[in-house]
Amino acid sequence: MPPFELGDPIPSETAHAVSVSLPTWSANVGYEEGQDWVVKRMATGYPRFFIHRTIQAFAADIVATHVSTKAKRTSDITAMLFPTPTIASRCVDFIRSRAPADVCSNIEVVNLVLDMSDPEARALEPLCPSISAVIMPQDGFPFAKQYWQHSGDGVSSRRAEFCHGLFKDGLLRPDTELRNAAVSAAKPCRGPKRYQRQASLDAGGNQQTIMHGHIHRATGETAMIQETSRFLEERFGRNLDLSFVHPAKSAIKRRIAGALRSADHDLGGSPSLSEKQMSSNTRGIANLREEDIYLFPCGMNAIFHAHRALYSIRTPPGSTPLKSVNFGFPYVDTLKILEKFNPSGALFYGHGSKSDLDDLETRLESGERYLALFCEFPGNPLLTCPDLVRIRELADKYEFAVVVDETIGTFANVNVLQFADIVVSSLTKIFSGDCNVMGGGAIFNPNSRYYSALKSFVQQQLEDTYWPEDVIFMERNSRDFVARIDRVNANAEAICRVLQDHPLVKTLYYPKYNDSRANYEAVKLPQGGYGGLISVVLKGKKQAVAFYDAIETAKGPSLGTNFTLTSPYVLLAHYQELDWAEQYGVDRNLIRISVGLEGTDELINVFTRALKVAEEQSQYP
């Protein structure tokens, strides 16, 4: 892979890249400390931490237009963009629960919708490209950014790019303006659909049925979708066939279920995938259906809504909410969700060890009760695997839900659904692989005691906000997912062999070699491997810095890319709490390696050379 300069998107020349090049240890520190020599060179960043430039530009234009009618200075105002009014309202509630009174009293929401009196806008109606902007004083931005980062509810860069063009052309306008306009002849935009069954007539008289998140349209609306697709290509230069969006969602869901072979990706064929019976799957749950799988704009959004759903169905009106349990050292925002979106907070077991599980059992035996237990399998970055068999036994006995994040293990290597009520995953990672689109997934176990209540919550409360362009990219990227996993598994084991016996390596973290290997083996599929994520701690910081600076891979945030990606993960994820992380055995100088598809011999040489540089550095005092 060619070297990346500081701040370059990874992959290079990719408008919607998910990672960014931080090629030296000092660049990572500079990023965390907000130093200009790093921040000003960043073309992009990881989307939940770095707001994409296209989103920033759109927000600035909304603010400029809005304040021109309010006699305020643009420099005093900022905006955060969300796909729907409901989500924007949740962000406002979050800000008002934390921000000073002068900030809270000056928050507004501007909802931009299609001006359906314009014939061009009517052609875009099936896309429903809405935007809700939370406009606030600059002092409110840090609170809005917390919501954006933790929840994953923000707009995607592709949605923002498309909607910004409509806004500039006058096709997307504030709903308050349109309410006062004479638009009675226009068809209303239905807005993001909820995952529910319903039959209705649209404003044009065509019957439509929404079943399990898929819209089945009459002939008139099918023709409209075809017209919209032609219009998108002619007017905006976008080759986006909307007739493929719903089959693409179906294909993604079936891949997640393990019910679709890699070769089955002809979305233009006869009956759509959503209309076929899902006859078998690799999850070991015979009654699992496609409609038990939900797609989200990113993985953290899947976790956020899993928690939101369980909180809702298990917290009767007027009752004190139950705490959740975070078992094992988690990805940074998972714990933040459990702590910040539940007034009762969370019980945190950072080691995820047998003694932690013993302590939890003691608490349960003494009468303590919990909303849900959230865990990763394996954990990030230590690759520790919780004892899912025992956790399931405790959950059944003491009635709490189990949510397992399978992002790192992947369903091609492990089967965790049998022990979970909900399984979540970041599709942004190895499922996509191309590092150019975000996505998340959640599976409801149909055998869960909470299944019916969860389905009811979804039908009433969950909005489908996964932008169609992102869906199309995710479906295309994921077609060869299983084959890529096999290659990554083999490459990861080869790199482990290079690291395992090297004198500079203090600790190697990988499911095959960790103390918790038995827990991994309990759910490992017969054809599965141990995944593509490795963490390593060298003998000292000096050696870690030398190794990182010398390694000839892409270097930046994220994981699960088709190319090897290296990161001083703890610096990036926990820079403000390094001492806290070390209490749980997470070394501040840990280096995380996401293994890619390069040739095995090539990777062995790359890691051998970097270790040699680190070795030479250790010769100097």
UniProtKB/Swiss-Prot annotation:
**What does the record give as EC number?**
2.5.1.48
Q: Which GO terms describe its molecular function?
A: cystathionine gamma-synthase activity; pyridoxal phosphate binding
Q: Which domain of life is it from?
A: Eukaryota
For activity, the cofactor(s) needed are: pyridoxal 5'-phosphate
Task: Note the SS bond partners.
Answer: none
A GO BP annotation: transsulfuration
Residues bearing N6-(pyridoxal phosphate)lysine?
Answer: 429
Q: Which reaction does it catalyse?
A: O-succinyl-L-homoserine + L-cysteine = L,L-cystathionine + succinate + H(+)
User: Which keywords describe this protein according to UniProt?
Assistant: Amino-acid biosynthesis, Methionine biosynthesis, Pyridoxal phosphate, Transferase
Enzyme class, first EC level, given as a word: transferase
InterPro entries named among the record's database cross-references: Cys/Met-Metab_PyrdxlP-dep_enz, PyrdxlP-dep_Trfase, PyrdxlP-dep_Trfase_major, PyrdxlP-dep_Trfase_small, Trans-sulfuration_enzymes
**Gene3D superfamilies hit by this protein:** Aspartate Aminotransferase, domain 1 (3.90.1150.10), Type I PLP-dependent aspartate aminotransferase-like (Major domain) (3.40.640.10)
Annotated pathway: Amino-acid biosynthesis; L-methionine biosynthesis via de novo pathway; L-cystathionine from O-succinyl-L-homoserine: step 1/1
Q: How does it assemble?
A: Both met-3 and met-7 are required to form a functional cystathionine gamma-synthase.
Physiological role: Catalyzes the formation of L-cystathionine from O-succinyl-L-homoserine (OSHS) and L-cysteine, via a gamma-replacement reaction. In the absence of thiol, catalyzes gamma-elimination to form 2-oxobutanoate, succinate and ammonia.
Family as reported in the entry's similarity comment: Belongs to the trans-sulfuration enzymes family. MET7 subfamily.
Q: What is the protein name for this chain?
A: Cystathionine gamma-synthase
Look up and give the organism this protein is from: Neurospora crassa (strain ATCC 24698 / 74-OR23-1A / CBS 708.71 / DSM 1257 / FGSC 987)
